[in-house]
Design a protein with these regions (language model features):
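Membrane-embedded alpha-helical bundles that constitute the cytochrome b-like, heme-associated redox core
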Residues: 1-172
Length: 172
């Protein structure tokens, strides 16, 4: 559960940082924020690996039978689709960002110490082709996070089925 909340906070922070930094004029401050954004992306990628390993080795608790029976089939399908797409995007967004950074010729030097390898060649054309995919996938992930939060709030305020309490720290 800790990984869930750390990733949630990190994703909100990096998305906000991404929106903010791209609106700044070219400056040392903007370059610094781009580095922070890259570092956060690498951290999110590492946390996503841990989260996936945890999810594979630790099944989530089953829904209470009454809740399972009351939930329409479309909601179950939406729940599973949203979670699966979020996992895909946990990896896709930072990897696409890494590819964009590599293609643009701006290496990622994690925490200013460890240079990550470029995994695509430097190419202005490739960078221009990759950049919109990073943005679109980030917006897709933000949209799915909003759907995820809205569904949790729906369960709390409309269904009143206690599902949200199961997601809060210390409530299992």
């Amino acid at each position: 559960m800790l990984l869930h909340w750390v990733l949630a906070i990190a994703l909100i922070a990096i998305f906000g940082l991404g929106l903010y930094m791209t609106g700044l004029p070219f400056s040392p401050q903007r370059l610094k924020l781009y580095n922070w954004h890259k570092w956060a992306g690498v951290t999110i990628l590492a946390l996503s690996v841990l989260r996936l390993v945890w999810r594979i080795t630790h099944r989530p608790p089953a829904l209470p039978l009454a809740m399972e029976r009351a939930m329409p089939v479309w909601q179950k399908a939406a729940h599973h689709a949203t979670h699966h797409l979020l996992y895909v995007l946990f990896f896709a967004v930072p990897l696409i960002g890494w590819a964009y950074s590599s293609a643009a010729g701006f290496p990622i030097v994690f925490l200013g110490v460890w240079q990550l390898p470029d995994f695509v060649p430097v190419s202005k054309e490739l960078a221009e082709a990759i950049k919109p995919w990073h943005e679109l996938s980030a917006y897709a992930m933000a949209g799915l996070v909003v759907v995820h939060v809205a569904a949790a709030l729906k369960h709390q305020t409309i269904d009143r089925d206690g599902l949200l309490q199961r997601m809060l720290p210390g409530k299992r």
